[in-house]
Amino acid sequence: MMNMQSMMKQAQKLQKQMEKGQAELAATEFTGKSAQDLVVAKLTGDKKVVSIDFNPAVVDPEDLETLSEMTAQALNHALAQIDDATQKKMGAFAGKLPF
């Protein structure tokens, strides 16, 4: 069994690696798209919206519901990518905990 000092060193090392992973994710930009790429949302890995771009074909003052649905679709697509990337990058640390 590991002694306490060794466990603490390993935990500190893992914490630094996790912080680095979180910073890398935050600096990464993810792009989500609606059907036919009519709405494109760009978010950072820490889930901050960078931009939302609309194809003029989807902007119809008489049909704002479709624009709203496509915007939500694009945002959810980007958020799913962020969640997947986070799980891949940060999930690896769960098995490395010394306790």
From Swiss-Prot:
It comes from the Bacteria. It is found in: Cytoplasm, Nucleoid. The keyword Cytoplasm applies. GO terms for cellular component: bacterial nucleoid; cytosol. GO terms for molecular function: DNA binding. InterPro entries: YbaB-like_sf, YbaB/EbfC. Keywords: Cytoplasm, DNA-binding. Residues 1-23 are annotated as: Disordered. Residues 1-15 have a biased composition (Low complexity). Binds to DNA and alters its conformation. May be involved in regulation of gene expression, nucleoid organization and DNA protection. Belongs to the YbaB/EbfC family. Homodimer. This is Nucleoid-associated protein SSA_0326. It comes from Streptococcus sanguinis (strain SK36). The lineage of its organism: Bacteria, Bacillati, Bacillota, Bacilli, Lactobacillales.
